[in-house]
């Protein structure tokens, strides 16, 4: 069976031009124009998808099969090209019958051309083949356009579904163009509207808890760039004005012992007029023990020093993936559960914006894992948000799972985050010592997001940072009142 790609090559039909026209028409459709205006960040993501569309269309045209009737007509045309004019005259009746039997668009015109000329000349032979070729090119082009139109409708339907999904989730998960691009890539899965509405629901809850959202942003930014002085700095002259004490008599600051006659206290001056005390006065004058007023002032002078020219390189601290462990015990149900899920959604938003990974582990009596930043991130997020917190608390297993994950090179420089109320039994000594070793040797950082004010200090002491979000009724009312 002849393929459409082979037919295009034989007839020199330019499929690239047809593909480009179809893509331009798709991007100019009213549905996409409205969407681009409403969500400009996603426009770049969709535009970046165009090469994939182009390649898919090429593959579709390459694998498409030509109808048997057209295949037979093309074969007949190729054989006719090899005939000389006398041979063509002999084969002409069979050619006309074949065209009629195949319902070729060229059949009627071919018969009219032959009937209009009583003699078949070499020029008529050439004209017949040229017009037949034009008819085949038109048929091949029409077939290409039909297939591309089918693909356009299918592609437009797919894009509209993804636009609906991305448009709903863009305000929740896309903080910049990078996040918008990753969100668009994730939207390729088969999702129903009721599924992703769960993400919308928790996104709205997160907006109602700005303190929780701000806490997630602070945790995400906890690794800031550090400035490091250069070692090859040159020396430069630095001038500054310094203030220092002076003897300029500006104000009385107290009393002192000295030989300053001009600032003698009246009682000291009185002893000079008493004969019996005159020698005592001179002795104290020589020894600078007379009581005098202490006057002080201040003066400014220019100080010149040499110091290195300060040039600093900013060492951007690596922001690795998030490994988030969520306590799903019964005490974490209700409002705590909503806050924990919304906090993970906020970390997912940060991970998408900063091109980081976000890995979720639910721990109770068993551990369930989700990766929210992978190609199936939206589906994974929906499955995570659908979980209910009704298990027990096994914090030790949580830490062991984190430490096992940190052994892999792909999780180098990860931030481990544990979300819990930390109302649990103390950690085993081997777990505590291993965590401290990871902190000391590999500089891994462990964050605690405490959902209760009653967490055990002995457990929380192991963390590098403790982010508190009290979910008690009093704290909730205070937060609402402050807004």
UniProtKB/Swiss-Prot annotation:
SMART domains: VWA. Belongs to the ViaA family. It is found in: Cytoplasm. It comes from Escherichia coli O7:K1 (strain IAI39 / ExPEC). HAMAP family: ViaA. This is Regulatory protein ViaA. Coiled coil: none annotated. Keywords: Chaperone, Cytoplasm. GO terms for cellular component: cytosol. Its main location: cytoplasm. Component of the RavA-ViaA chaperone complex, which may act on the membrane to optimize the function of some of the respiratory chains. ViaA stimulates the ATPase activity of RavA. The keyword Chaperone applies. The gene is viaA.
């Amino acid at each position: 069976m002849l393929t459409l790609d082979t037919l295009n090559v034989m007839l020199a039909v330019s499929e690239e031009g047809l593909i480009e026209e179809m893509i331009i028409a798709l991007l100019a459709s009213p549905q996409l124009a409205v969407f681009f205006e409403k969500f400009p960040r996603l426009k770049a993501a969709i535009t970046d998808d165009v090469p994939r569309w182009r390649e898919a269309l090429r593959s579709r045209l390459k694998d498409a099969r030509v109808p048997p009737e057209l295949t037979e007509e093309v074969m007949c045309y190729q054989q006719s090209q090899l005939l000389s004019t006398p041979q063509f005259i002999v084969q002409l009746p069979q050619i006309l019958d074949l065209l009629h039997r195949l319902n070729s668009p060229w059949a009627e015109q071919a018969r009219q051309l032959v009937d209009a000329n009583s003699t078949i000349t070499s020029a008529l032979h050439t004209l017949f083949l040229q017009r037949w070729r034009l008819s085949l090119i038109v048929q091949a082009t029409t077939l290409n356009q039909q297939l591309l139109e089918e693909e356009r409708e299918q592609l437009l339907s797919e894009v509209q579904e993804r636009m609906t999904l991305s448009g709903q989730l863009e305000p929740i998960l896309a903080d910049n163009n990078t996040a918008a691009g990753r969100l668009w890539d994730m939207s390729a899965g088969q999702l129903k509207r009721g599924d992703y509405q769960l993400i919308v629901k928790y996104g709205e809850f997160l907006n109602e808890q700005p303190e929780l959202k701000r806490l997630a942003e602070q945790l995400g930014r906890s690794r800031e760039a550090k400035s490091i002085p250069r070692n090859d700095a040159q020396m430069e002259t630095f001038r500054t004005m310094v203030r220092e004490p002076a003897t300029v008599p500006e104000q009385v600051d107290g009393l002192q012992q000295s030989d300053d006659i001009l600032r003698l206290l009246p009682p000291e001056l009185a002893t000079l007029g008493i004969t019996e005390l005159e020698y005592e006065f001179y002795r104290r004058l020589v020894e600078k023990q007379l009581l005098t007023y202490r006057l002080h002032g201040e003066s400014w002078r220019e100080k010149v020093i040499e110091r290195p020219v300060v040039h600093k390189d900013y060492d951007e601290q690596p922001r690795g993936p998030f490994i988030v462990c969520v306590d799903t015990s019964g005490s974490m149900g209700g409002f705590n559960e909503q806050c924990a899920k919304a906090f993970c959604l906020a970390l997912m938003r940060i991970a998408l914006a900063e091109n980081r990974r976000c890995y979720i582990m639910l721990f109770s009596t068993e551990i369930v894992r989700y990766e929210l930043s992978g190609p199936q991130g939206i589906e994974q997020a929906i499955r995570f948000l659908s979980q209910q917190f009704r298990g027990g608390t096994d914090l030790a297993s949580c830490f062991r799972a984190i430490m096992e994950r940190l052994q892999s090179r792909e999780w180098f420089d990860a931030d481990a985050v544990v979300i819990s109320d930390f109302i649990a039994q103390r950690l085993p000594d081997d777990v505590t010592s291993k965590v401290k070793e990871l902190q000391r040797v590999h500089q891994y950082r462990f964050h605690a997001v405490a959902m209760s004010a009653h967490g055990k200090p002995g457990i929380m002491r192991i963390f590098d940072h403790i982010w508190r979000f009290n979910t008690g009724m009093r704290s909730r009312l205070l937060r609402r009142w402050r807004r």
